Swiss-Prot record:
Function: Specifically methylates the N7 position of a guanine in 16S rRNA.
Keywords: Cytoplasm, Methyltransferase, rRNA processing, S-adenosyl-L-methionine, Transferase
Location in or out of the cell: Cytoplasm
Residue sites binding S-adenosyl-L-methionine per the record: 89, 94, 140-141, 153
Protein name according to UniProt: Ribosomal RNA small subunit methyltransferase G
GO molecular function: rRNA (guanine-N7-)-methyltransferase activity
Pfam families associated with the record: GidB
Origin species: Koribacter versatilis (strain Ellin345)
UniProt gene name: rsmG
Length: 219
């Protein structure tokens, strides 16, 4: 008899433990299974290429998955939300892949110029059966199209991302960045007339990490 997937062990973290670590974010069983498969792949690939500096599996769940799922719910409170999202410089897939898992009604495009990382992302999409996500192995400047929301993390110079973001986000759409609090403070001084800060929210349990959400001007 097949055991409930919550009881099965994965090479990284048991599925039931993933659910505990993500608490108070409650994740459906199907999504937990996808997260577990994703985490397993990330740990295997990270052993031979630099996808994330965080090596401890539980810390990956707490920080990377926790922050990404929090962002999903802040950006799209409705579980049945639809629309388009582009994740720029997706790298290991955060926050784009967890958002696609958490909000299956969205159309999510993962942009990653680094060939090996793009290959990893394609394997994640295939293995987790993410029918609402696709990968483009290009630079953000080469992407054709606009989205309702653009997401980014590991932003080094906030001012440098704004011109590219303005081209990718539809008028009235949003840019969401996972930042350190000093970078969020920097954002206020450089966003210019094209953007306005919608809100800045600290991630649960953190005084250093924030989700900055800006809205593009209508014109």
């Amino acid at each position: 008899m097949t055991r409930n997937f919550r009881e099965r062990k994965m090479p990284g973290v048991e599925i039931a433990r993933i659910a505990e670590l993500l608490d108070p974010i409650v994740v459906a069983e199907r999504q937990l299974e996808q997260i577990s498969v994703y985490l397993d792949l990330l740990l295997k690939w990270n052993a031979r290429m630099n996808l994330t500096a965080v090596r401890d599996p539980e810390q990956i769940v707490l920080r990377h998955f926790g922050e990404s799922l929090f962002a999903a719910r802040e950006l799209f409170p409705d579980p049945d939300a639809t629309g388009s999202l582009v994740d720029v410089g997706s790298g290991a897939g955060f926050p784009g892949v967890p958002i696609a898992i958490e909000r299956p009604g969205l159309s999510v495009t993962l942009i990653e110029a680094h060939g090996k990382k793009a290959t990893f992302l394609k394997e994640v999409v295939r293995s987790t059966r993410l029918t609402n996500a696709s990968v483009q192995a290009i630079r953000a400047e080469e992407y054709v199209g606009v989205a309702d929301v653009v997401t980014m993390r590991a932003v080094e110079e906030f001012a440098s991302i704004l011109p590219v973001s303005a081209r990718l986000v539809r008028p009235g759409g949003r840019l969401a960045c996972l930042l350190g609090s000093p970078q969020a403070a920097e954002a206020e001084g450089v966003i210019g007339e094209c953007w306005r800060t919608e809100r800045t929210v600290y991630f649960p349990g953190s005084t250093q990490r924030v989700l900055w959400i800006g809205q593009r001007a209508q014109k």
